[in-house]
């Protein structure tokens, strides 16, 4: 089994022997399936229903079969117990009826190997943005980043923005979006506050029903555009504590 990184998908090669009296049969998505549970060290379930892997053929008593199992490592990093299990779909898990299953202690590593964040500023150079980036708690990099954050000219991230983004990536989130705070005069702020309400500061939300705006993305992911801002519409974390002041006087945000 390869090293596991929080939130990342991988493949484990598993060899099983049918030590029972009945043939193992998968019937598409039904029948007997191979799956797994992620447990903490006290055997409490962290992720109970892992993806199902059907057997490639019937496995008679006494036979062995090799199966490649798609694993998704849990969040956050730490030490977990990985228990492989067989499930008779819609009926029962074999471990629940006393069948002993293989358990492994697994150290799940951070989602990023190094805390290296780069920034792409979309638009012309801006002194406000440059000053805010220079004041970050965790310095930014130009080479070999683990993740790249996307801003627009005039945006001013808070000093802890880089740290909070890297914390979330280390937890296993490939995409992280900050909270947006409208800047400008009172009228612009009031109007923008209604439009930006879904991205207002607050807690963390892994199920935001809107695209992440001004996202930070691990290598391999690219932003799209939403409301003329860099965005990401896939799975990700809205980090409502990471604040970015967004200019409202620009034509970019006027309707």
State what each model feature region is:
Residues 24-25, 91-101:
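Beta-sandwich strand segments
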Residues 35-55, 98:
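Short beta-strand and strand-turn-strand segments in soluble, beta-rich domains
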Residues 70-78:
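Short, surface-exposed loop/turn segments at beta-strand-coil junctions that are enriched for proline
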Residues 109-135:
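N-proximal low-complexity "stem/linker" segments adjacent to membrane-targeting elements
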Residues 143-158:
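Short beta-strand-to-loop acidic/aromatic patch adjacent to the donor-nucleotide binding site
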Residues 160-191:
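Conserved donor NDP-sugar-binding/catalytic core segment of glycosyltransferases
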Residues 179-184, 188-216:
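Short, flexible, basic/aromatic active-site loop/helix in glycosyltransferases
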Residues 232-254:
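Active-site donor/metal-binding and catalytic loop motifs
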């Amino acid at each position: 089994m390869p090293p596991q990184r929080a939130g990342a998908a991988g493949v484990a090669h598993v060899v099983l022997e049918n030590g029972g009296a009945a043939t193992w049969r998968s019937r598409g998505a039904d029948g007997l399936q191979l799956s797994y549970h992620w447990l903490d060290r006290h055997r409490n379930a962290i992720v109970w229903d892992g993806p199902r892997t059907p057997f490639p053929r019937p496995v008679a008593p006494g036979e062995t079969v090799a199966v490649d199992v798609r694993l998704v490592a849990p969040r956050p990093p730490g030490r977990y117990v990985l228990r492989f299990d067989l499930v008779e779909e819609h009926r029962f898990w074999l471990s629940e009826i006393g069948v002993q299953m293989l358990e492994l202690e697994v150290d799940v590593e951070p989602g990023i190997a190094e805390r290296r964040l780069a920034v792409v500023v979309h638009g012309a150079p801006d002194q406000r943005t440059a000053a805010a980036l220079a004041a970050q708690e965790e310095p930014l990099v130009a080479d070999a980043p683990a993740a790249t954050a996307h801003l627009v000219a005039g945006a001013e991230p808070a000093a802890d923005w880089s740290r909070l983004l890297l914390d979330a990536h280390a937890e296993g989130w490939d995409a992280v979006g900050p909270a947006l705070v409208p800047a400008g005069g009172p009228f612009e702020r009031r109007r923008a506050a209604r439009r930006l309400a879904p991205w207002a500061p607050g807690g963390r939300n892994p199920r935001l029903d809107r695209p992440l705006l001004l996202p930070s993305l691990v290598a391999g992911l690219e932003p799209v555009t939403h409301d003329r801002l860099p965005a990401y519409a896939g799975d990700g974390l809205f980090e409502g504590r990471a604040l970015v002041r967004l200019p409202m006087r620009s034509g970019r945000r006027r309707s």
